[in-house]
Protein backbone atom coordinates (compact mmCIF):
# COMPACT_ATOMS: atom_id res chain seq x y z
CA UNK A 1 0.00 0.00 0.00
CA UNK A 2 0.87 3.69 -0.10
CA UNK A 3 -0.36 6.92 1.45
CA UNK A 4 -2.12 8.57 -1.47
CA UNK A 5 -5.02 6.20 -2.09
CA UNK A 6 -8.62 7.31 -2.53
CA UNK A 7 -10.00 8.20 0.92
CA UNK A 8 -6.47 7.68 2.23
CA UNK A 9 -5.46 7.28 5.85
CA UNK A 10 -1.75 7.26 6.76
CA UNK A 11 -1.84 3.62 7.78
CA UNK A 12 0.44 1.46 5.62
CA UNK A 13 0.98 -1.84 7.42
CA UNK A 14 -1.74 -1.45 10.04
CA UNK A 15 -4.07 -4.27 11.04
CA UNK A 16 -7.26 -5.15 12.88
CA UNK A 17 -7.68 -8.12 15.23
CA UNK A 18 -10.98 -9.71 16.20
CA UNK A 19 -11.37 -12.67 18.56
CA UNK A 20 -14.54 -14.72 18.07
CA UNK A 21 -16.11 -11.76 16.21
CA UNK A 22 -15.29 -9.41 19.11
CA UNK A 23 -13.13 -6.36 18.22
CA UNK A 24 -9.76 -6.12 19.97
CA UNK A 25 -7.36 -4.08 17.79
CA UNK A 26 -9.45 -1.75 15.66
CA UNK A 27 -9.38 0.87 12.93
CA UNK A 28 -11.59 3.77 14.00
CA UNK A 29 -12.73 4.43 10.43
CA UNK A 30 -13.95 7.86 9.41
CA UNK A 31 -16.16 10.36 11.18
CA UNK A 32 -18.87 12.59 9.79
CA UNK A 33 -17.78 14.08 6.47
CA UNK A 34 -17.00 17.79 6.58
CA UNK A 35 -15.10 20.24 4.40
CA UNK A 36 -11.94 19.35 6.33
CA UNK A 37 -12.25 15.70 5.30
CA UNK A 38 -11.46 16.68 1.72
CA UNK A 39 -9.16 19.71 1.99
CA UNK A 40 -5.54 20.36 2.93
CA UNK A 41 -6.34 19.94 6.64
CA UNK A 42 -7.48 16.33 6.20
CA UNK A 43 -4.56 14.89 8.13
CA UNK A 44 -5.25 17.06 11.16
CA UNK A 45 -8.21 14.73 11.77
CA UNK A 46 -7.10 12.22 14.39
CA UNK A 47 -8.56 9.14 12.69
CA UNK A 48 -6.53 9.81 9.52
CA UNK A 49 -3.22 9.93 11.36
CA UNK A 50 -0.63 7.17 11.60
CA UNK A 51 -0.38 7.43 15.37
CA UNK A 52 -4.07 6.53 15.81
CA UNK A 53 -3.59 3.30 13.88
CA UNK A 54 -1.86 0.08 14.93
CA UNK A 55 1.54 1.34 13.86
CA UNK A 56 4.79 2.67 15.31
CA UNK A 57 6.20 6.15 15.59
CA UNK A 58 9.78 5.54 14.43
CA UNK A 59 12.40 7.78 16.02
CA UNK A 60 9.53 10.14 16.83
CA UNK A 61 8.26 10.25 13.23
CA UNK A 62 4.86 9.21 11.88
CA UNK A 63 3.88 8.20 8.35
CA UNK A 64 3.08 11.26 6.20
CA UNK A 65 0.66 11.54 3.29
CA UNK A 66 1.97 11.09 -0.24
CA UNK A 67 2.36 8.44 -2.92
CA UNK A 68 6.09 8.17 -2.19
CA UNK A 69 5.35 6.82 1.30
CA UNK A 70 4.76 3.15 0.65
CA UNK A 71 5.61 -0.39 1.66
CA UNK A 72 7.97 -2.75 -0.16
CA UNK A 73 9.05 -6.40 -0.15
CA UNK A 74 5.61 -7.70 0.72
CA UNK A 75 5.38 -11.43 1.42
CA UNK A 76 2.47 -13.73 2.24
CA UNK A 77 2.48 -17.45 3.09
CA UNK A 78 -1.04 -18.68 3.81
CA UNK A 79 0.18 -22.15 4.74
CA UNK A 80 2.14 -20.61 7.62
CA UNK A 81 -0.41 -17.92 8.45
CA UNK A 82 2.24 -15.25 7.82
CA UNK A 83 2.26 -11.81 6.17
CA UNK A 84 5.16 -9.34 6.16
CA UNK A 85 6.17 -6.06 4.58
CA UNK A 86 8.93 -3.47 4.94
CA UNK A 87 7.58 -0.12 6.17
CA UNK A 88 10.85 1.85 6.01
CA UNK A 89 9.82 3.87 2.94
CA UNK A 90 6.42 4.70 4.45
CA UNK A 91 8.21 6.97 6.94
CA UNK A 92 9.95 10.31 6.28
CA UNK A 93 13.73 10.77 6.03
CA UNK A 94 13.93 12.23 9.54
CA UNK A 95 12.98 8.81 10.92
CA UNK A 96 16.40 7.55 9.82
CA UNK A 97 14.74 4.23 9.08
CA UNK A 98 16.65 1.86 6.79
CA UNK A 99 14.51 -1.20 7.53
CA UNK A 100 11.27 -1.83 9.40
CA UNK A 101 9.91 -5.26 8.55
CA UNK A 102 6.57 -5.92 10.17
CA UNK A 103 5.45 -9.55 10.28
CA UNK A 104 2.04 -10.88 11.30
CA UNK A 105 1.73 -14.54 12.28
CA UNK A 106 -1.45 -16.40 13.15
CA UNK A 107 -1.41 -19.42 15.47
CA UNK A 108 -4.94 -20.84 15.22
CA UNK A 109 -4.20 -24.08 17.09
CA UNK A 110 -3.95 -24.45 20.83
CA UNK A 111 -4.42 -21.04 22.43
CA UNK A 112 -5.28 -18.85 19.41
CA UNK A 113 -2.85 -15.96 19.08
CA UNK A 114 -1.53 -13.28 16.76
CA UNK A 115 2.15 -12.35 16.89
CA UNK A 116 3.33 -9.00 15.52
CA UNK A 117 7.08 -8.62 15.06
CA UNK A 118 8.89 -5.43 14.03
CA UNK A 119 12.51 -5.97 12.95
CA UNK A 120 14.29 -2.69 12.34
CA UNK A 121 17.51 -0.88 11.51
CA UNK A 122 17.91 2.88 11.93
CA UNK A 123 20.75 5.18 10.88
CA UNK A 124 20.91 6.41 14.48
CA UNK A 125 18.72 6.58 17.56
CA UNK A 126 17.49 10.17 18.06
CA UNK A 127 14.12 9.67 19.78
CA UNK A 128 12.17 6.77 21.28
CA UNK A 129 10.05 4.49 19.13
CA UNK A 130 6.44 4.35 20.26
CA UNK A 131 4.30 1.40 19.21
CA UNK A 132 0.58 2.22 19.11
CA UNK A 133 -2.38 -0.16 19.38
CA UNK A 134 -5.96 1.15 19.18
CA UNK A 135 -8.34 -1.01 21.20
CA UNK A 136 -12.02 -1.29 22.01
CA UNK A 137 -12.13 -2.05 25.70
CA UNK A 138 -10.43 -1.11 28.93
CA UNK A 139 -6.76 -1.83 29.57
CA UNK A 140 -4.95 -3.20 32.63
CA UNK A 141 -1.32 -2.07 32.48
CA UNK A 142 1.74 -3.73 34.04
CA UNK A 143 1.58 -3.27 37.80
CA UNK A 144 -2.22 -3.26 37.72
CA UNK A 145 -4.31 -6.09 39.11
CA UNK A 146 -6.99 -8.25 37.56
CA UNK A 147 -8.86 -10.90 39.52
CA UNK A 148 -6.27 -10.76 42.28
CA UNK A 149 -3.21 -11.08 40.03
CA UNK A 150 -0.69 -8.26 39.57
CA UNK A 151 0.53 -7.99 36.00
CA UNK A 152 4.31 -8.16 35.48
CA UNK A 153 6.36 -5.91 33.23
CA UNK A 154 5.83 -6.81 29.59
CA UNK A 155 2.21 -7.88 29.99
CA UNK A 156 -1.13 -6.09 29.77
CA UNK A 157 -4.75 -7.13 29.49
CA UNK A 158 -7.47 -5.83 27.19
CA UNK A 159 -10.95 -6.25 28.66
CA UNK A 160 -13.20 -6.44 25.62
CA UNK A 161 -16.92 -6.68 24.91
CA UNK A 162 -18.91 -9.67 26.17
CA UNK A 163 -16.42 -10.31 28.98
CA UNK A 164 -13.60 -11.36 26.62
CA UNK A 165 -10.13 -11.01 28.15
CA UNK A 166 -7.12 -10.76 25.84
CA UNK A 167 -3.47 -10.75 26.93
CA UNK A 168 -0.78 -8.81 25.11
CA UNK A 169 2.86 -9.52 25.86
CA UNK A 170 5.63 -7.17 24.75
CA UNK A 171 9.30 -6.41 25.51
CA UNK A 172 9.64 -5.46 29.17
CA UNK A 173 11.93 -2.58 28.13
CA UNK A 174 8.94 -0.75 26.62
CA UNK A 175 7.03 1.63 28.89
CA UNK A 176 3.26 1.22 28.64
CA UNK A 177 0.64 3.95 28.90
CA UNK A 178 -2.90 4.51 27.64
CA UNK A 179 -4.68 7.47 26.02
CA UNK A 180 -8.47 7.72 25.84
CA UNK A 181 -10.18 9.16 22.75
CA UNK A 182 -13.67 10.33 23.65
CA UNK A 183 -15.94 9.80 20.65
CA UNK A 184 -18.21 12.82 20.38
CA UNK A 185 -18.93 12.24 16.68
CA UNK A 186 -21.98 9.98 16.37
CA UNK A 187 -20.51 8.27 13.33
CA UNK A 188 -17.76 6.92 15.60
CA UNK A 189 -19.77 6.40 18.77
CA UNK A 190 -22.50 4.56 16.87
CA UNK A 191 -19.94 1.89 16.03
CA UNK A 192 -17.54 1.87 18.98
CA UNK A 193 -19.45 3.38 21.87
CA UNK A 194 -18.33 6.39 23.91
CA UNK A 195 -14.56 5.96 23.61
CA UNK A 196 -11.57 4.07 22.23
CA UNK A 197 -8.23 3.57 23.96
CA UNK A 198 -4.75 3.76 22.51
CA UNK A 199 -2.00 1.66 24.04
CA UNK A 200 1.41 3.34 23.80
CA UNK A 201 4.55 1.22 24.21
CA UNK A 202 7.61 3.49 24.24
CA UNK A 203 11.21 2.39 23.92
CA UNK A 204 13.92 3.94 26.12
CA UNK A 205 15.49 7.11 24.64
CA UNK A 206 18.79 5.24 24.24
CA UNK A 207 17.31 2.06 22.74
CA UNK A 208 19.50 0.30 20.16
CA UNK A 209 19.24 1.51 16.57
CA UNK A 210 18.92 -2.09 15.42
CA UNK A 211 16.75 -4.83 16.86
CA UNK A 212 13.21 -6.11 17.06
CA UNK A 213 10.00 -5.82 19.07
CA UNK A 214 7.56 -8.70 19.44
CA UNK A 215 3.93 -8.42 20.52
CA UNK A 216 1.75 -11.47 21.12
CA UNK A 217 -2.01 -11.23 21.48
CA UNK A 218 -3.64 -14.27 23.10
CA UNK A 219 -7.23 -15.02 24.03
CA UNK A 220 -7.69 -15.83 27.72
CA UNK A 221 -11.41 -16.52 27.41
CA UNK A 222 -14.49 -14.87 28.83
CA UNK A 223 -14.51 -13.95 32.49
Where are these regions (language model features)?
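Extended polysaccharide-engagement surfaces of secreted carbohydrate-active enzymes
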Residues: 1-223
Amino acid sequence: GYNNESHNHNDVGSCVVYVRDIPVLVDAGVGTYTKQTFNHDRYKIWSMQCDWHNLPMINGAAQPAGAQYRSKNTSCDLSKGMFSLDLADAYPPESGCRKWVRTYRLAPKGAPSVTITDSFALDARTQPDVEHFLVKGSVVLPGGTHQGRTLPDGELLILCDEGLVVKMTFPASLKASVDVMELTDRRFSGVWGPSLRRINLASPPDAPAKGSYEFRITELGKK
